[in-house]
Amino acid sequence: MTSALYSGGGKSAGSLESALDEERLEVLRWMKEREEKKHRQLALQYDPIVRDYCLVKHGDSGYRMDSSLMTSLPHSRNPPIFEAIQGEQPSDIDTLNLKKVKSGPTSPSSIDRLSSPNAKAGDILASSLFSSGSPPDTTRRNSTSNLSSVSTNSDKSRTIGSNYNMLQSTKSTASQRRMSDSSTPSTTKSKEKIFSPKALSSPTQGASSNVTPESPPEKPIPSFVLSPPPVSATNEANKLSDIQTSSPSQDIPAKHLEPLHLNRSLSSSPSSEDSDLSLSSDSDDDEKKQPSKSEKTSSMSVSIKPPKIIRKGSKEQNRIAKEKASGAPLTKSKSHNDTSTEYDSNSLRRSRSNPAFANDDTVHPNTSFVSSNINNWYGSDLEELEQDVKTAKSMKVDIGPTRWIPTANRTIRCIRRGDFQTAASSSKRNCTYFLTLDLSSESLHAAEWAVGILLRNGDTLIIVDVIECDDPSARAVKDRMESEQLETLEKITKYILKLLSKTVLEVEVNIEVIHHEKAKHLIIEMIDYIEPSLVVMGSRGRSHLKGVLLGSFSNYLVNKSSVPVMVARKKLKKNKQRLGNQSRLANNLSDAIVDEVGRTP
């Protein structure tokens, strides 16, 4: 079945491929529309770039600069220029009358506009800005603003051409060229070239101007007029002829031309980062060595001093980058002819060579210790201990009532510290420890060790003190049994509370004082019944058996207990008076008392 499906599915496979191709084309069309929409939106979001422009209009005595046509147009947000005139947009630039004009004996034919009597002043801008060609790419700010320096004469004076849409024109014949040289109107289509104001201001050698006068435009361009100082018509005619003078091999290429609304003004400096970066470093050096053209034509320009911009790769930016890399302090200083801030890199050398120049402000590094009110050189351990002491004093202690049970010959008391129920429920392990205590020094040391080492929050400590007596049921014994148990219970309670006050434990302590004939047997039975986690006891009791490691009671519990037994042995005091010649045995039984109970004669 599978083979038949693959063998007979040739037609369906072709239709599937065609469907996939159509789907791909649809996706590509959708992506293209989306990109165009994105470019249009980005073009409206960028900040406008204010630039100054100047148009040349015809006059009776040749071409002249018209101060009323000095405009300041933004990048993309300004409304079209032709809308302010009549609201009409030229359909195509081919309908305009253009002619070639030659000025000077050796200069090539420059292209200029010969307007018809019905031509508008805004047609020249509208034809280049709103032509039927593809719109400029607006994915990047000033993407169409690619300024480049063009050499126009032997003095290497730089001019910047401007043209947005260079139309393809047919080659003009020799007769048409002769007609243009003789100032005869020609209908040949040619490329349109509009000289920027900066190009108009470039000084060249003197040359005569042979330009056919035409009627002036009907209305000036009503757009953000920025009027310069008055200019004479004769000087402008001479300067226009100087601009048109060039060699045949130095025609301005089309790739160096840009729209008129993106040209630079007569005196404005670079106003965007992209235009600054596109200028070469050679042109910057030439501008520093030679006097600026705007200074020579100060009567034609408007004095606008923009802020200084640190260009990419400049010496100032490299110096700042080196200072940042070396960690030197950036000291600001102002030059005599510049208002921008600069940084002094010599402050680091002065501070290292002579400490007097360095700042007196000491640097205090940040530490991980939390600031506290304790003014001492100790670390955070002491602060933690004092905080624990404050917490321990503030914790509540619940001391239960004393219960005396005559039938069992015992007295019981329960002590709870802190929130024991919450601690027991939240603890991962709840241990129960069994402590034998007879108020001897060894047993008190065992109690201190158990509270300080073993106990954790939620644990339970059972303290048992067994008092041996011959006949607990006797009346005389019962009368003093209760008072003795209460006295012992109070002593144990006082000692345990003293130990707990030095900790922040939330534990439960059960204290039992019992009278019994055989203390060893009773404790073994209690261990088997309670089943604690660990039994803690002292090395010896009240028998004062010196010289033995374990007493009889401790030795018995170690051998008979069903749970682990921990014997806390207190460190023995060294005897200062020692016999030098006598050897000391490890188990000295000279002072031992032999238990004669159960001996048979």
From Swiss-Prot:
Residues annotated as carrying Phosphoserine in the record are: 247, 281, 335
Q: Where is the composition biased (Low complexity)?
A: 141-154, 265-281
Gene Ontology CC annotations of this record? cytosol
Origin superkingdom = Eukaryota
Could you tell me which residues belong to the region Disordered? 127-364
InterPro entries referenced in this protein's UniProt entry, alphabetically:
Rossmann-like_a/b/a_fold, Universal_stress_UspA, UspA
List compositional bias (Basic and acidic residues) regions by residue number: 286-296, 313-325
GO terms for MF? catalytic activity
Q: Which UniProt keywords apply?
A: Phosphoprotein
* One family name in Pfam for this protein: Usp
Provide the protein name: Uncharacterized protein C167.05
Tell me the organism's taxonomic lineage: Eukaryota, Fungi, Dikarya, Ascomycota, Taphrinomycotina
